[in-house]
């Protein structure tokens, strides 16, 4: 790269010289003579200087003279390159003390030897005076260059040199930046790799900072934990820095499995790494320091948490040596701080170490079964196993932990596929594990649904009811509670044997159905023998409606029934071939028409209750129709609404009405008076309570004034009558109680239930007909026939009763509306809603009357004083106020 600027400098200088020369003769073209042609004779011959080159040959000289006479070229025109085939003659030199060509003297010409043969035509030739061509010398008569041309030449040369220098500096700067970036890109990876390698090794064989290595081609120890870096310190350990002068030691060891190895302790490479090989000892105060690698159990299966994973190898490449550093680390947690759970496991496992403390062994995943294996042999993950035990205790004199390393480890095996968790368990319990066996059993129990409650802390200062509970007073049925309240886990399989992975029950019944049947059998607490005996005798009272309904849900399909019937009797006792649900169903299928019997018995059990419900419903409907027709207060209310509505609709098409549908009763509260509070229903109720209060006779039990009736004022009499009339109107809801019940019924459901009862009798007859062909069914047929005689009679009575009630409902609908309704029970719903509104209005009117009594009653009122009515009485020509307080018209109504 440094030669480029110099080449550029040389080319620039060359062109600068030629440029200066061209500027000096800038006014002459190439085809014009440099000096005007002189016709005078050439100057006299002067002998050439000894330093000049020899003169050309006579042939060249004569050719030159001929060319001068014919073409007369310019005297100073120079041709730098010429061809051998037709070489142009060299131009004559101007008057000069040392001319380039000598005069044409025959003697001098003859003295020179003949010229050499010309070169080939393809190669150019250079004239002998190339130096004079590059650097021409002017004669004395030529005009010297002026000062302006010299200044321009110097300026141009300096500019070119400066530009070349700047370009050179820029090129050097670019090269420097590229090298710096290349170093920065390569150095972080190397530093990170070496730093990680040093941090991951608990005992460093040599530092990675460029210091001299002990062995260039020896791999670092493999069997170290990837997380025993300086960042992870543990309680109760301290580094002993006095063990810096240790030398590398080797001691053979033997494992229980016949595996031999060498314990190698490399010396520390620097003072910074000497602490890694120091002894760990107890301190009085807790201080966090790194622990030695974990010792191995007497089992080939390592123990890990559910969140940890195995990473069998890890390779780091160190510079040009390509040295592989293998470490053991849980996958997914490299470079992270270990969880407290992992630290606790390390402490527990360290207590079981062979030497007590300070011992070390290889990682379970990277330990090779054969230490003498060839490097070319590839180990599979299956062949990787941890050491079982050590026959001899391994310890150093100064307590420094050692590492178990093979003489020449084989190449690392390929990593196994990543797994979510390692289902490994310990072969024996840890020392000092005082956990109860009950706690171990609880861990194997299935998870149940959670009961959310508030726990009460035990108190030693007071006596509580919980103190009287004994541990053995109540035993939980584990089998039942697990069956009923177990949390459904689709990934796990049940441990109670209800649904077995490989069993005969999956070949006969659907697994879900089989599971449900088993749950029902446990919940009902009934055996197959009891059910079969009740089915044979036809005793429906023994089983009950709930059990019969559950049995009916267990009915298998035709295909399942055929499979269960094909089972041999020898297979019944084999729990591996048939499950509890299949056993129960097979026992039922041994009875002829078992599920038809169950259906018939369920009908018999429900028959009495169904008949009673339907008869009661029909009685309610019948009573409701009678209440609507015969309740005087309801009819009086309809009369008041009709007359009030005709009065309001005078002059319209809705006036002079003779009847209205009961739906109008619900619209009375929508019409409000001028005050915005009193509605049309309030007005009707006020008028009715006046009329009804006047009709109620006074008795001593009804009035506290008794004998002093004549002395009471008219105001008090009017308020008392309103109070009595309000009680009569508000009692309308109690008089129409059956109407409210009938409003909750559905005519379609009553009709369908009646038809279903009638169809059930037909099913019982069908079962009796089919069982007459079987043997051993006498007791069942006897039970069915006794019910059939009574049931047919009750069904006939129920159907006739239902028909009569439906006719009455239709009649009452026509009685109020004049025609039949699509929904015959709708009239009861309308009346029920109106009664709810009427009760609310009566309460509001009662509160208004009480405020009127306490706000308007004088302390001493004269006997002849009359009270002002709450509502003004409007008397027109066609109406008058009767003495009884009712509004009488000319027609005599109300």
Curated annotation (Swiss-Prot):
Biased composition (Basic residues): 59-68
SMART domains the record matches: FH2
UniProt subcellular location: Membrane
Residue ranges with Polar residues bias: 298-310, 331-342, 351-377, 390-399
Record GO terms (molecular function): actin binding; actin filament binding
Transmembrane stretches, start-end: 156-176
Pfam (any one): FH2
Leader peptide range in chain numbering: 1-20
Cross-referenced Gene3D superfamilies: Formin, FH2 domain
Main location: membrane
Biased composition (Low complexity): 101-111, 270-288
InterPro entries, per database record: FH2_Formin (IPR015425), FH2_Formin_sf (IPR042201), Formin-like_plant (IPR027643)
Biological process according to GO: actin nucleation; barbed-end actin filament capping; plasmodesmata-mediated intercellular transport
UniProt-annotated stretches for the region Disordered: 41-129, 203-228, 264-440
Family: Belongs to the formin-like family. Class-I subfamily.
The protein, known as: Formin-like protein 2
Organism, as annotated: Arabidopsis thaliana
